[in-house]
């Protein structure tokens, strides 16, 4: 048994911490990993609830196995070197004391539920080589305030960031192709989001319950799943897609939020203009207020009827412009 084991220093020639080595050793509070270690096995430190210090100064660690630090509820930080590639499923599940999730640039894969319920973490850094973010990988990380998904990521898993209720800023880089079901649901503080042109699929209920969400920018040929924005009471969707595009599920906009079809965007992705036609405005009425579009470093000042002109219409007076009018977004630098 390991009931009285408190400090662990491993042999310096060790290259692997084998699966289940310190499983359930609840009294361990300090571990020093040798510099030659390349992998930490499945459940190696599972349930080490007193573990508060992991010392590692090496540069060879490439993989952290499934459940490796599962429920290590007293671990405030962990340095994993700069060679780490794979983080297994549930690897840091419920590490509620973890203050920052600062992943080395070498990381490529983040397994399902890897940092699920790390409710103490206030910052997250994803490096430029992450290709896949697993299902629920960062779900219920309730102290995160911003999330930036790099261009290397191809897919964001189901529920990946669900319940990250403090996130106000979400950046999704060009390159991301798929966003899973409920991936960003219940992000109650999120105020706006611009989806990249590279995105081919937005999953069911991906932004469901984002109750503070205003402007949503959808560019390119994105297939949108059922209830994608359900319950997003202040959302307005700005898209360059046509009204009759066939790649949206029937109930993609099941909360009947305002949609502006056929928008023209700049290369940087901000709104330039919009033409009022019989089908370009959907669900714009007195009880369905239009949220202003968003541009970094600027505030939206209204709609002009000539390019570079002064604002003639307020954001929610779109419906008053005659059919055939092209409206130009007026931006004021902050």
Name these PLM-found stretches.
Residues 1-8, 23, 46, 93, ...:
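Short intrinsically disordered, low-complexity coil segments enriched in acidic
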Residues 32, 78-79, 265-334:
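Secondary-structure capping and domain/repeat boundary segments
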Residues 234-271, 302-304, 332:
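Extracellular/surface-exposed low-complexity segments
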Residues 18-23, 41-46, 65-70, 88-93, ...:
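Consensus positions within tandem repeat domains that build extended binding/scaffold surfaces
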């Amino acid at each position: 048994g390991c009931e009285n084991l408190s400090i662990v220093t491993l042999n310096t020639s060790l290259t692997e911490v084998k699966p289940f080595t310190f499983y359930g050793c609840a009294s361990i509070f300090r571990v020093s990993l040798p510099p030659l270690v390349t992998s930490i096995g499945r459940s190696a430190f599972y349930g080490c609830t007193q573990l508060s210090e992991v010392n590692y100064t090496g540069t060879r660690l490439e993989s952290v196995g499934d459940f490796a630090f599962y429920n290590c509820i007293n671990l405030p930080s962990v340095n994993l070197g700069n060679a780490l590639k794979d983080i297994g499923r549930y690897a840091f599940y419920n590490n509620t004391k973890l203050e920052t999730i600062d992943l080395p640039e070498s990381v490529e894969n983040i397994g399902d539920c890897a940092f699920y319920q790390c409710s103490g973490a206030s910052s997250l850094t994803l490096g430029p080589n992450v290709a896949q973010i697993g299902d629920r990988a960062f779900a219920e990380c309730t102290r995160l305030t911003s999330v930036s998904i790099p261009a290397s990521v191809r897919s964001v898993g189901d529920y990946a960031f669900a319940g990250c209720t403090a996130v106000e800023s979400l950046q999704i880089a060009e390159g991301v192709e798929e966003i899973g079901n409920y991936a960003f649901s219940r992000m109650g503080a999120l105020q706006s989001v611009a989806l990249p042109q590279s995105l081919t699929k937005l999953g069911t209920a991906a932004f469901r319950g984002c109750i503070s969400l205003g402007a949503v920018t959808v560019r390119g040929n994105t297939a949108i799943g059922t209830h994608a924005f359900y319950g997003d009471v202040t959302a307005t969707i700005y898209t360059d897609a046509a009204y009759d595009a066939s790649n949206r599920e029937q109930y993609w906009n099941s909360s009947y939020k305002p949609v502006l079809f056929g928008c023209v965007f700049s290369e940087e992705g901000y709104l330039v203009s919009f033409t009022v036609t019989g089908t370009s405005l959907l669900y714009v009425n007195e009880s369905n207020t239009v949220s202003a579009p968003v541009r970094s470093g600027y505030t939206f000042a209204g709609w002009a009827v000539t390019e570079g002109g002064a604002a003639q219409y307020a954001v929610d007076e779109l419906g008053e412009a005659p059919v055939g009018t092209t409206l130009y977004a007026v931006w004021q630098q902050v």
